[in-house]
A protein has these predicted regions:
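Alpha-helix-loop-beta-strand connector modules within alpha/beta enzyme cores
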Residues: 62-76, 132-144, 168-178
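Active-site groove signature of glycoside hydrolases
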Residues: 100, 104-124, 148-156
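Conserved beta-strand positions in the central sheet of alpha/beta enzyme cores
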Residues: 41-43, 113, 150, 187
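Acidic/histidine-rich catalytic cores of soluble enzymes
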Residues: 141-207
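An active-site-proximal structural segment forming one wall of the substrate-binding cleft
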Residues: 86-109, 127-145
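N-terminal pre-domain/capping segments
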Residues: 1-105, 181-184
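Alpha-helix N-cap and loop-to-helix initiation/capping positions
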Residues: 21, 25, 84-95, 123-133, ...
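Acidic-and-aromatic substrate-binding clefts and catalytic sites of carbohydrate-active enzymes
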Residues: 18-24, 43-55, 120-122, 129, ...
């Protein structure tokens, strides 16, 4: 490659994975990433402390970075499932994702990414409908702010065991979502490719 990679990509990093909170101070981490000219984007997640959140917002506003927001930790930490067949628990996950949209907007992100929850074979069809319900609600809220909602495709039978899941299932879900919301898309992690069976052409379905 003759040219810099930045000519072709916005190179970013996931803040909480590059600098795990158990080992790194959040503000120091953001400063480090923002001062590294190699990066032009950063993905952050929910910040519990209001004062710290304000400081991070200020740092990001002063930086050259495109801001992305990952809501996955907000679901995985408390064990919430956006496709939970129990309606009350599903609503809890939905509320967390709607709050994530608001926090993402505050921090300067153009949308959020999240993942589907675990599933059981005998309730898979119901779980699919529950996930549609959750995602449509979150997309409706995000659309009012001009923001995107992206579902990250994970493995369906190994580590995360997420409903979305098999690539053909992801393509079907995206098609169903796009009949009602044009601010929905799929987010694909290259490291997940081997765990999603045969991958159909659905890298990103968004406007």
């Amino acid at each position: 490659m003759k040219d810099s990679i930045q000519k072709y990509f916005q190179v970013g990093t996931i803040q909480w994975m590059s600098h795990p909170p158990i080992s790194y101070d959040l503000l120091d981490s953001i400063k480090s990433i923002a001062s590294d000219e190699y990066f032009s984007a950063v993905e952050v997640t929910s910040i519990m402390d209001e004062e710290t959140r304000k400081k991070v917002k200020h740092l990001l506003e002063q930086s050259h970075l495109k801001v992305c927001f990952g809501a996955q930790p907000s679901l995985l930490g408390p064990g919430l499932n956006p496709n939970d067949v129990d309606e009350d628990r599903r609503k809890q996950a939905e509320e967390v994702l709607i709050k994530a949209v608001d926090e993402a907007e505050y921090l300067g992100a153009g949308g959020i990414a999240f993942l589907a929850g675990k599933w059981e074979e005998d309730t898979k069809a119901l779980a699919y409908e529950q996930l549609l319900k959750t995602t449509r609600s979150v997309c409706t809220h995000a659309a009012q702010k001009g923001m995107m909602v992206e579902l990250e495709v994970f493995d369906f039978d190994m580590d995360k065991a997420a409903l979305i899941g098999p690539a053909p299932y992801a393509a079907r879900f995206a098609a169903d979502m796009r009949t009602t919301h044009n601010n929905f898309g799929l987010l694909v992690d290259l490291s997940h490719f081997p765990t999603t069976t045969i991958f159909t052409p659905c890298l990103r379905i968004s406007s």
